[in-house]
Amino acid sequence: MAIARRISRIASLIKQEISQMLLHGIKDNRVGIGMVSVTDVDVSGDLQHAKVFVSIYGSDEVRSQTMAGLRSATGYVRSELGKRIRMRRTPEVIFVEDRSLERGTEILSLLNKLSQERQQQEIEDITHKESHQDTIE
């Protein structure tokens, strides 16, 4: 239990520090072209690896350029983490694009579209029934 709490605390610290680096530290122009935010950090049980999930707002080209910039800045990020967080060994940083927010937005859009289609169908059914009853009378 204490180990899991420590891993969670370290992940939170890494998330906070990398978020600050994205705002002020990373000088690669490719990282600045898309809005980048750290959505989650997953630290391995042995504290050797940290998967940093990032959400990037922009076109596919902007996303790929931003990911390339982040991957090239991995050494700098790891070095800075070593300076900012006191640990015996700084974990290896692996950037992973997180598209869950985008997928969530797409799903909500589809659900809204289905809801509108259902409402339209119900209106058509009601008007069809009313016109059918008028012809019977």
From Swiss-Prot:
Q: Which GO terms describe its molecular function?
A: ribosomal small subunit binding
SUPFAM superfamilies in the cross-refs: Ribosome-binding factor A, RbfA (SSF89919)
Q: Which residues form the signal peptide?
A: none
Q: Share an example GO biological-process annotation for this protein.
A: maturation of SSU-rRNA
The UniProt record lists the keyword Acetylation = no
Give the main localization category.
cytoplasm
**Where does the UniProt annotation locate this protein?**
Cytoplasm
Q: GO CC annotations?
A: cytosol
Keywords (A to Z) from UniProt: Cytoplasm, Ribosome biogenesis
Glycosyltransferase among the record's keywords? no
Q: What does this protein do?
A: One of several proteins that assist in the late maturation steps of the functional core of the 30S ribosomal subunit. Associates with free 30S ribosomal subunits (but not with 30S subunits that are part of 70S ribosomes or polysomes). Required for efficient processing of 16S rRNA. May interact with the 5'-terminal helix region of 16S rRNA.
Q: Which family does it belong to?
A: Belongs to the RbfA family.
- Self-association or partners: how does it assemble? Monomer. Binds 30S ribosomal subunits, but not 50S ribosomal subunits or 70S ribosomes.
Put simply, this protein is called Ribosome-binding factor A
Instruction: Specify the taxonomic lineage.
Output: Bacteria, Bacillati, Cyanobacteriota, Cyanophyceae, Oscillatoriophycideae
